[in-house]
């Protein structure tokens, strides 16, 4: 789930940046501090927007920089259990498929792809159904549901487990065929 979060912080403006527009400097400092990092309870920070920097700064003894209060928006992504997502198959292995969800990747275990008995063909890099003859391969567009999000070491992306074994989930091509 994508979130738009309003935040406040204090930004250090180094002396070599004096004379430049405050909002630009603050934006660069905030990007270095937050962007592409995972923040507890907020998720993966994708972008920093709408920076408003206070004109008045504070000085700290022994530091030539000024410190300014800033307000800004962050766009974050947090995978939520039961969320339905669409993505592209990045990799096919004997144990399942990896799906790009945008900011993160998820794994659909081979047992969670369809109700059919599935086989992996390592020569062609595909998984196919024995009875249905359904094929899934790299580049396919799929719809899946998040069934678990396992936190890993702080600062690392979580492991996302997906399923496609429910109605209206699976390869998009299979879904449109089932509707007919």
From Swiss-Prot:
Family affiliation: Belongs to the eukaryotic RPB7/RPC8 RNA polymerase subunit family.
A GO molecular-function descriptor: DNA-directed RNA polymerase activity
Domain S1 motif: start-end pairs: 82-165
Keywords, alphabetical: Cytoplasm, DNA-directed RNA polymerase, Nucleotidyltransferase, Transcription, Transferase
UniProt entry tagged with the keyword RNA-binding: no
InterPro entries associated with the record: NA-bd_OB-fold, RNA_pol_Rpb7-like_N_sf, RNAP_E/RPC8, RNApol_Rpo7, Rpb7-like, Rpb7-like_N, S1_domain
Gene3D superfamilies xref list: Nucleic acid-binding proteins (2.40.50.140), RNA polymerase Rpb7-like, N-terminal domain (3.30.1490.120)
Catalytic activity as recorded in UniProt: RNA(n) + a ribonucleoside 5'-triphosphate = RNA(n+1) + diphosphate
Protein name per Swiss-Prot or TrEMBL: DNA-directed RNA polymerase subunit Rpo7
Gene Ontology annotations for the cellular component aspect, listed alphabetically: cytoplasm; DNA-directed RNA polymerase complex
Complexes and interactors: Part of the 13-subunit RNA polymerase complex. Forms a stalk with Rpo4 that extends from the main structure.
Location within or outside the cell: Cytoplasm
CDD domains linked to this entry: RNAP_E_N, S1_RpoE
Cited function: DNA-dependent RNA polymerase (RNAP) catalyzes the transcription of DNA into RNA using the four ribonucleoside triphosphates as substrates. The highly mobile Rpo4/Rpo7 heterodimer is conditionally required for transcription initiation.
Free-text note regarding domains: Forms 2 domains with an elongated structure; Rpo4 packs into the hinge region between the 2 domains.
UniProt EC number: 2.7.7.6
